[in-house]
Amino acid sequence: NSEFHDSPSTVTEPDDETQGIANHLIAFFEKEVAEDRLPKNLGPLQAGIGSIANAVLTGLKDSNFEDLIMYSEVLQDCTFELIDAGKMKFASGSSITLSAKYGEKVFNNLEAYKDKLVLRPQEISNHPELVRRLGIIGINTALEFDIYGNVNSTHVCGTKMMNGIGGSGDFARNAHIAIFVTKSIAKGGDISSVVPFASHIDHTGHDVDVLVTEQGLADLRGLAPRERARAIIDNCVHPMYKDALNDYFNRACERGGQTPHILREA
């Protein structure tokens, strides 16, 4: 029945951790622009679905960036918040999913957004050649990542599926800059989101350029595996787990290898 409303998405409010991630990302973007590696409006942005990516993109409201554009698969609250704030001038997607709060506002005022949105077939929104040609910056959420930059975005503890890979694979593999964000710890600190060896891998280190937690940002572009590990441990790991990961990495390096591991412990 076309009169049925969409089921609203569950979106948690931004917090200190997501604001920290946003701040690190904004600083990274500012540096890229200053060094002429990105245009002043950053170029097309893609945002993965979920509370963390949504909160991080919303953080761009407090940045100096203007005339932002989005080329994504699913448009969520952050898209419309940036449009309402005058920060984003246009967004392209294949579908819209909104919280109950924002859904009512948007769907009751579609006239206000009709010249700022376009919805395309998924074959176009996620097309690898288009993603690459447009120079998209892909920002997606990780459940965990390991010290070499391999990202698990779907399986809790490697076995329990939390969500599908969605469009993150399409965008991460083909984006100009592939960024993954997550909080450095989960379950109140009982679990580190940065691990020696990812329990499930959706995105290999070859497809990952930048990793961000509230602790900091690791720019992995052009780095060898050991350099990637050092950048991730130094910048992304929560202090509760930094000593343990440093110890693991140092002992693994003593064994040698291009990508050192102690598989019995990893």
Language-model-detected regions and their locations in the chain:
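Metallocofactor- and cofactor-centric catalytic cores in central/energy metabolism, strongly enriched
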Residues: 1-121, 130, 134, 144-148, ...
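Residues that form or immediately flank small-molecule/cofactor binding pockets and catalytic motifs
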Residues: 124
